[in-house]
């Protein structure tokens, strides 16, 4: 004889399992996909970094034009529109090998081998420069600016992170624990994210303790780091990959152009358009992908 209460219990358990399974399947986010939208012309010259100004809809492009550490004065900054047109190829000139960029209140901060330069966005003229402590042993690479205007700069060859705060330019942290830092991203008031090229890791630097913790690894030559505007990050590998890293440190491959020998240097994300902008370095273009 079937026990009615036992049957009811079994049905409830089964229903609960089905509901739980359904909820778990819904909770798992769909994989992201990149769809190419446009590619600029090839008049750029070794574009290393791109930066979007949401107040003007201008895309800035740092062009090395030459070797990445050569002091030849041939580097320049271009301006582009959101549809991929180069509106001013040589907007700011006279740089050496410009790379990472950051914006704050009408000032564009750009690394230039051994120095950080401050450019007035209204004129395109360099107004201030900040030299590395040892100009012959410096390779300043990426820039990030916190909401309060504090500027952080990585030195990827000589394991340093500089800070420019209230006009004071200093080394914030140095040493092999940085593992050749490249990409940097201000992440709130208490920390910055650092891409350690030597280990292919995305790491968090606590600004109070200067201790580092690893968020995700296995991304080869980590270059650009940008937020998705929520709780995740897009990270580029200079060799030609782009990853998405969620808040739990789980990474997802979005782009791999290594077989075509197309690099992906210091990327940008335009949240309003869901566009990832990828400078292709030796291919002399910027490519825009829609995140779907």
Q: Which residues fall in each region the model found?
A:
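Beta-propeller domains
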Residues: 62-83
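Short loop/turn segments that connect beta-strands within beta-propeller blades
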Residues: 80-84, 120-125, 164-168, 206-210, ...
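WD40 beta-propeller blade core
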Residues: 78, 117-118, 162, 203, ...
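Beta-rich, blade/repeat-based domains predominating
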Residues: 43-56, 73-74, 92-108, 134-151, ...
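Asp-box/WD-like beta-propeller blade repeats and closely related beta-sheet repeat scaffolds
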Residues: 34, 115-148, 154
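Bacterial N-terminal signal peptides
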Residues: 9-18
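Short glycine/acidic-enriched loop and turn motifs that connect beta-strands
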Residues: 65-69, 115, 158-159, 199-200, ...
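A short beta-strand motif characteristic of beta-propeller blades
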Residues: 35-41, 85-92, 125-133, 168-175, ...
